[in-house]
């Protein structure tokens, strides 16, 4: 499994697992940028906050970000204006601008050393295939941005890529893990209750409480900040209906060192679909570039290593002096109308998801919106991002397209001809789905050659998981749940681990491994 640059440089947190019943004003589920920022802002207001995460704080998608702080959304401004109207389009971009300003305020107020840098952003014609984008309309995009009050301009040749672009000057770069480490310290100093390796299991009502294992956090308000929202008080059926409006995509990134060049220090996003993105920042004596893209539905790429290889090849063309030092991938959640879902889903319960490629900005904005909801303060983005907002014209078609994966993979996996029991178990450091005694098993062999197995059936809605060779995870192709090599839940919408394989089935599997070893030696 690859590790992001942020994770390599992060300060390791160490908080206890919840081991008693406690009481708080607000319980926050999920310790990424949304959850930690929410806890920080609420504790600043004097509220008693309990923050829990199923692993370590910041170890989820926040640590796999490429950390672009921008108000330029994945859905183009012209498209936002066409679908929602100019005022709603302005509100969406203003949300990102507000989030950047909020992070800047916190960095200054707390004197956070997080490599904060103001940088320009360029939405540009792609490095390759530029003839296909002759009618790019970037001049119109820039003109509309100016009309709506944003400092944008059209340029004939963006730095680094040398292509026509819309330039926005007031974006930013930072180190997300260093930033969040300080926020965590402040929450603790203000009496916050922080628990790691504490997995949510339910939300009770009357009185309200978050259940985690054998213990409860009694609270007046719950903020669900878990990338893909857990079921909460809405119930499983309503949760499944809501989760079906979310589409999980995997995105890949490579990090590289390169000689210092002040002109190159900026952010870049091309017009491809899926698009490639680049950010270059000063780091010590050198510059550091992060180049990403190659997005696909989670669990649906047979050879994820190829995604990294293709990115490295293209980066070498754009920045020939770049020396790749890091690889990592992350997951982004898309919605059917291109806007996030942020708001209350029932009384006393707030969710935030669907940030697409703007997780750092929308995550920060969601924290501010959660604080406003708890304080009963009017918020200008409430209607635009509300989870129950009406579907726009294009949304039903996008919904059908994104949800076709579920029946397609169910049919493919369960109606395919039955295979005989497989003999060869995975090689060291790999996994494969095997059919053993009529069971579909997710079989993993660690570097020491030890076999472990669990059910290959995703506990969310029953699809079969796939082995991700690049990240050493089991990924569900239907709704994007991800599991560790031995079946531990990493990301929802599933809320349980893959069921462990024990007893006769595991013994049978190990016997298969011994038989295969004998066959290999005989050959």
Model region roles, listed by residue range:
Residues 202-280, 423-424:
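Flavin-dependent oxidoreductases
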Residues 254, 433-523:
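Rieske [2Fe-2S] iron-sulfur-binding domain
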Residues 24-51:
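N-terminal Rossmann-like FAD-binding beta1-loop-alpha1 element of flavoenzymes
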Residues 144, 166-220:
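Helical element adjacent to the flavin cofactor pocket in flavoenzyme catalytic cores
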Residues 44-64:
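Glycine-rich FAD pyrophosphate-binding loop
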Residues 1-8, 75-81, 102-182, 190:
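Flavin (FAD/FMN) cofactor-binding and adjacent substrate-gating region
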Residues 272-273, 297-399, 454:
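C-terminal catalytic lobe of FAD-dependent flavoproteins
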Residues 1-26, 498-501, 506, 517-523:
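Extreme N-terminal leader/targeting segments of oxidoreductases
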């Amino acid at each position: 499994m690859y590790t992001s640059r942020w994770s390599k440089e992060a300060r390791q947190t160490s908080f206890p697992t919840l081991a008693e019943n406690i009481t708080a004003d607000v319980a926050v589920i999920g310790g990424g940028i949304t959850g930690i920022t929410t806890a920080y802002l609420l504790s600043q207001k004097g509220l008693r906050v309990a923050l829990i995460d199923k692993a370590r704080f910041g170890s989820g998608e926040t640590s796999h970000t490429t950390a672009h702080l921008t108000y330029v959304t994945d859905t183009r401004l012209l498209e936002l204006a066409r679908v929602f109207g100019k005022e709603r389009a302005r509100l969406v971009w203003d949300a990102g601008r507000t989030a950047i300003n909020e992070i800047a305020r916190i960095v200054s107020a707390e004197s956070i050393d997080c490599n904060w840098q103001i940088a320009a952003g360029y939405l540009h014609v792609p490095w390759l295939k530029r003839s296909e984008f002759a009618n790019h309309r970037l001049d119109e995009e820039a003109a509309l941005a100016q009309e709506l009050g944003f400092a944008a301009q059209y340029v004939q040749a963006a730095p680094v890529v040398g292509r026509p672009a819309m330039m926005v000057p007031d974006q930013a770069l930072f180190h997300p893990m260093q930033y969040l480490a300080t926020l965590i310290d402040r929450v603790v100093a203000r009496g916050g209750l922080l628990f790691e390796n504490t997995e949510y299991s339910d939300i009770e009502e009357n009185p309200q409480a978050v259940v985690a294992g054998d213990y409860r956090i009694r609270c007046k308000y719950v903020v669900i900040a878990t990338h893909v929202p857990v079921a909460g008080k809405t119930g499983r059926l309503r949760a499944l209906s809501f989760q079906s409006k979310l589409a999980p995509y995997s995105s890949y990134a490579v990090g590289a060192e390169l000689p210092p060049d002040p002109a190159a220090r900026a952010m870049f996003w091309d017009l491809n679909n899926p698009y490639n993105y680049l950010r270059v920042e000063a780091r010590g004596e050198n510059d550091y570039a992060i180049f990403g893209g190659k997005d696909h539905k989670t669990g649906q790429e047979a050879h994820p290593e190829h995604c990294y290889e293709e990115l490295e090849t293209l980066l070498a063309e754009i920045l020939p002096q770049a020396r790749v030092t890091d690889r990592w991938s992350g997951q982004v959640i898309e919605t059917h109308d291109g806007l996030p879902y942020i708001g209350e889903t029932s009384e006393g319960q707030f969710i935030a998801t669907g940030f697409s490629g703007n997780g750092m900005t929308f995550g920060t904005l969601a924290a501010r919106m959660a604080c406003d909801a708890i304080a009963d303060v009017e918020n200008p983005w409430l209607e635009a991002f509300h989870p129950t907002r009406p579907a726009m014209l294009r949304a039903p078609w996008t919904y059908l397209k994104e949800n076709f994966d579920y029946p397609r993979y169910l049919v493919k996996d369960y109606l395919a001809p039955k295979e005989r029991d497989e003999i060869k178990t995975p090689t060291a450091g790999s996994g494969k789905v095997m059919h053993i005694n009529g069971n579909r098993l997710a079989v993993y062999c660690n570097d020491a050659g030890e076999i472990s197995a669990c059910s290959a059936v995703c506990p969310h809605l029953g699809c079969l998981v796939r082995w991700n060779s690049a990240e050493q995870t089991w990924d569900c192709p239907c709704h994007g749940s991800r599991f560790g090599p031995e079946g531990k839940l990493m990301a929802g919408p599933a809320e349980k681990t893959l069921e462990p394989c024990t007893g006769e089935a595991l013994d049978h599997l190990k016997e298969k491994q011994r038989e295969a070893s004998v066959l290999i030696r005989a050959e």
